[in-house]
Amino acid sequence: NTNSAKGEGVISTFTISSDGTTITEVGSLEHDTDKGFWNSLVQVDSDTYALAYQGAGDDGFIATFTISSDGTTITEVDSLEHDTGKGSHNSLVQVDSDTYALAYAGTDDDGFISTFTIDSDGTITAVKTQSEGNNLEHDTSNGSHTSLVQVDSDTYALAYMNNTNSAKGEGVISTFTISSDGTTITEVASLEHDTDIALNTSLVQVDPDTYALAYTGTASDGFISTFTISSDGTTITEVGSLEHDTVRGFYNSLVQVDSDTYALAYDAGCCGTASISTFDIATSTPHQVGTVSTTS
């Protein structure tokens, strides 16, 4: 929020050395002078990127950019206001070569899934969106804190928070089939995995039918749970769960390190203490391996 109390939208590029000892900012573009919240960025091709974010009026936007391979030039190509009511808690994934699916919280924080086509030059076309009046409202109680991942060629798993039975917001994983052209979106199955609360979700695939979810649970503690999800999305089963931080586990970002090791970056303290922890996640209950120190 350099120039705006609301918080402008910015894309920046960095070079990071192979050993992690140097991190240098290369370029920066203020692409929205009003607001740029709840960002989800994906690569379209070698130099084109798509960003879902909440912009002016809290509306939902998709914008595309070309970014040079050295990061020195960042250029906005196209922009689409896909939801004129609200567009927060975005999670954008690629469906096929030019089709993309977006899970987000819309009006009244209800859960929506929309689809778009984005061609190699960055042109965006609405397929199933609120602006077209034809997207999927999959949860009418709440659909925030989303994390969407691909299960197979046309099946997707979405971790999110709803509040059907709890004012705090239970943890849910639902599956959907989405056609390769984005014209059909169908809910398949749903599992309420935490009856208390599940915020700040980050879902990753472990193997063809195993998934790991980092989230903020009871008492704001940090949890990692594992699930099996069938390739057609019809069965979702919780396998194991680990309460890895009994103080705080906010703003999670979980990534794979190798075949069974995962790193989690999260807010671990009352004053925004950043932490990185590693975990061994196989097909059973995950366990913590250690914490990661900064590179000097």
Describe the role of every protein-language-model region:
Residues 1-296:
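Extracellular, repeat-based ectodomains that mediate carbohydrate processing or recognition
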